[in-house]
Design a protein with these regions (language model features):
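A composition-driven surface/loop motif
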Residues: 1-149
């Protein structure tokens, strides 16, 4: 299962759990909050894609990655001179673009983590409410059963 499938599965589970809450307004509010969080998560994925496209526009990442692999191979063999010579071939614009992208990506990941934490808090609250409603329902059922006896 990839990340998207896992998120989709969690989304379905959360919606089912939300549907178990008896208080209609609370159920509606929680469902709307959950939808908003899901949209924010989707927007995050699209933001990262856009940032990546802009950051690496006109840059040959494959060539850069091949050169980095050669540098690492030379270093692992202990050939520091060859590694240094290969490092001189690195395009400074590509290196800067990668650093800039990594900084932006890290910022976005922090935002995504905050979204996920809120989502988890919401899911935990929803689960607790559903359990509480279920417990109340069981109590009501037991009361009715004892009255009928």
């Amino acid at each position: 299962m990839n990340t998207r499938e896992i998120k989709d599965t969690l989304s379905i589970i959360s919606r089912v759990t939300i549907s178990k809450i008896a208080d209609k307004q609370l159920r509606k509010d929680l469902f709307n909050d959950y939808l908003a969080l899901s949209k924010a998560s989707k927007a995050f994925d699209e933001d990262i894609k856009t940032i990546q496209e802009k950051a690496f526009e006109g840059i040959d990442l494959n060539a850069h990655n091949e050169l980095v692999a050669k540098i690492r191979k030379a270093e692992s063999k202990g050939d520091i001179e060859q590694a240094e010579n290969l490092a001189k071939e690195l395009n400074p614009d590509t290196v800067k673009a990668i650093r800039d992208f990594n900084e932006l990506y890290e910022e976005k990941m922090n935002e995504e983590q905050e979204i996920e934490l809120v989502k988890i808090d919401t899911e935990t609250f929803v689960d607790a409410m559903a359990e509480q409603d279920f417990a109340i329902s069981m109590q009501e059922l037991e009361t009715l059963t004892s009255i009928l006896k």
